[in-house]
Amino acid sequence: MGTRSISIATALAVVFSSAALTVVVTAGSASAVTVGSSWGMVVDGARHRVFIGDDTRDKVVAADYNGNLVDSVSGIDGVADLALSEDGSTLYAAARASHEIVALDPATLDVKARYPVAAGSGPLYVEAAGGKVWFTYGEWGGETESDLGSIDPAVDPASGTDPVSLGQFPLHDHGVTGPAILDADPSTPGLLAVGQRDFYDSAKQLLAVVDVSGPAPRLVASQSGGPTVYVNDVDLLPGGSAVLGGATKRYAYADGAFTETASYPYGQRADVAPNGLVAQVGPVGDYRVSVYRPGESKAVRTYALDASQVAWAPDASRLFALVSGPGGDTLRVLTNPALSVPAITVNAPSTATRAKPLTVSGKVTATVKLPAGAQLKVTRTDMEYPNGKTLPAVTVKADGTYSFCDTPSSGGTVTYQVSYAGDAEHTPASAYDKVAVSRATPSLSLNNNGKVYAYGADVPFTAHLGSTYKNRTVEIWADPFGSDRPKKLIKSGTVNSHGNFSAVVDMARDTTVYAVFKGDSHYKPRTVKVTAYAKVRVSTAVSRHYKTGKIGSTTYYWFHKRTNPLLTTTMTYYPGRHQRFDLQAYYQGSWHSLDSQYFALGTNGKSVVELGAPGEAGVKARMRSVYVNGSSGDSVNSTTYGGWKYLYFSN
């Protein structure tokens, strides 16, 4: 059969309704086709349409060859199998719930006619052959065997002659109660393949070929009582006296009997294209779709799909599959289904030395051997050729292996992609592997490491870059201490003729400075860093003194012996920062530390300390404010000592 496929989904335990139908036709938008459940699918090659019966929604849907919904008709109560007339002018739908065959216009899905079938169950399966439309039916509960009926479209019911005829299956006492599956093939006109296994007793099975070209059906070959495979599907094979039974075994027929001639791995559904290609849905639990060439039992192509039905386009250019999903069965379009899909392996060394030869090898495997002398395209992608450079093509050996040598001029990650363009029997294929090719380490340095600078100093940092290939660009980054200031790019540019490049950094905090070379195809990236340090800005203002004057060579602030000096320190602010207040007194010819205390800075960076007066004259004291890295509440600057302020108390 070249244009249709059927499912064996059984609903014989359902009491079917014979209510009148209301038929509604709707035009669909360009969206994927999903049906609740389906018994039949047929392909119209002339119109490039795929018709699917949706039993869940009592409708027939039409899709284009891209799998998009283009039309639908509802009200086909219990729609089961579908078939196109031999001339393609009529689409027939078996409506099992309303017990009728509905004739539709395949171009519009308008109803052309309805043919009631006086059967207890069915009609279930339908096919066109010998100028008539054939269908199978049965009685409820297995009271009678399944049988064959026909419709003669040339008979006008208004003439008083019923176009529907029942009881035409020429084999009696076969014991199978369920309506049998039908199939026809354009290459063998006038023949029907009939097959089924009994719903109640799977040991009872039926396989037959019937000639329906004459006035009455004539049995050509039959086998009943249990073939060697469950007859859950049947296909009439094109161009010869053979059928495919149960989607698995090929039977030749002659002298009224069947002889098994070949078999495929076990399957449950199948469809056969006019050119003999077989598409098979795997057994329960393995619903992959496999495609077999005529006379071959090894699949040329396999699709990992959870499929329930398949149907060929008449020209075999496409295979249509209903694939199970959360919302039902979705139509999938499989293009070039008869082409073998090559698998290519690429094995390159994991590491290599730049400018040294390396060897890449691999193998091409396919269900159909590549033609002799087949060539593979080789592309190398690296830093110098980011869009790829085509290397000389490599020829595949008779055993499918290949190898080639190359000398990578660029270091870093080098990718070798090996591709086959495809041919009349193969799809395109491609694979790749990567090599880490060595690069030299460039010389890169940066000055000013460990130096300490005054707060806010503008300090030039100079990077020196040694020999490289093409890239002479250096970046200088600064990362000030403290989480509130991120690392930032200060400057980027090309080194001068001496290999130097400078950028000025504002030293408001201790700062890590980076020089970055991003590498080129011969030299690897490199980053160096230095850390330079910045002091805080600190000053102290003295007040409440009555004069200043020197004692020896040192200037003192003079206070009355009972006046408390007020000392206001201004220091670079940072959240949580404290100043250390150092106090010393002079006696016995030297300075002696009295106390050191930490005082918090305000958000304005100021700290005011009032010093208690000694109450006696002749006392000398001095104080200073200090930022201590780590002890002053943070570590973003370097320890900084303020200058001493000298105090003298007099009468």
State each model region's role.
Residues 305-342:
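Blade-level signature of beta-propeller repeat domains, shared across WD40, Kelch, NHL, RCC1
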Residues 36-44, 77-85, 119-130, 166-187, ...:
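Repeated scaffold domains used in trafficking and secretory/extracellular systems
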Residues 339-348, 440-448, 537-552:
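Proline-enriched interdomain boundary motifs that mark the N-terminal boundary
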Residues 58-61, 99-102, 142-152, 200-209, ...:
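Structural motif
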Residues 46, 129-130, 315-316, 410-431, ...:
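Enriched for extracellular/lumenal, surface-exposed ectodomains of secreted and cell-surface proteins
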Residues 44-45, 51-56, 85, 92-97, ...:
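Conserved beta-strand positions in repeat-built beta-propeller and related beta-rich domains
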Residues 30-34, 39, 68-74, 110-116, ...:
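A short beta-strand motif characteristic of beta-propeller blades
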Residues 1-32:
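Secretory targeting and sorting signals
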